[in-house]
Amino acid sequence: MVMTDPIADFLTRIRNGNMRKFDVVEAPASKIKRQIAEILKAEGYVKDVEYVEDNKQGVIRVFLKYGKNGEKVITNLKRISKPGLRVYVKSDDIPKVLNGLGTAIISTSTGVVTDKVARETNVGGEVIAYIW
């Protein structure tokens, strides 16, 4: 079976693992998935990210994070730009997720960055996902 949107699959694996309170979620690796996982780690949504090389494309292990009483750190993940409907924004139209409480992941000409970094560097791009 051909996967038409591997980024949506990656985000769905994280979302489903978070809902079931899994400690680790695994997904096939790619460059953009690695960058998204590193942003999730840098923003404090996940504990750690690990890359496992195999003879194929490799695997990304995302270690999910929960609060002291088991509450979820990630409330929701939403894919915005899809293969059938791409969503692009200019540097002055970059959205704020939940008035700044969430994070938008944007693919720019300088790489995959958060909405805050894109605003600071004054670059626009494709809105990949919202996380809050």
Swiss-Prot record:
This is Small ribosomal subunit protein uS8. GO terms for biological process: translation. PROSITE patterns: RIBOSOMAL_S8. The keyword RNA-binding applies. It comes from Lactococcus lactis subsp. lactis (strain IL1403). InterPro entries: Ribosomal_uS8, Ribosomal_uS8_CS, Ribosomal_uS8_sf. The keyword Ribosomal protein applies. Belongs to the universal ribosomal protein uS8 family. The gene is rpsH. It comes from the Bacteria. GO terms for cellular component: ribonucleoprotein complex; ribosome. Pfam families: Ribosomal_S8 (PF00410). Disulfide bonds: none annotated. Part of the 30S ribosomal subunit. Contacts proteins S5 and S12. Keywords: Ribonucleoprotein, Ribosomal protein, RNA-binding, rRNA-binding. GO terms for molecular function: rRNA binding; structural constituent of ribosome. One of the primary rRNA binding proteins, it binds directly to 16S rRNA central domain where it helps coordinate assembly of the platform of the 30S subunit.
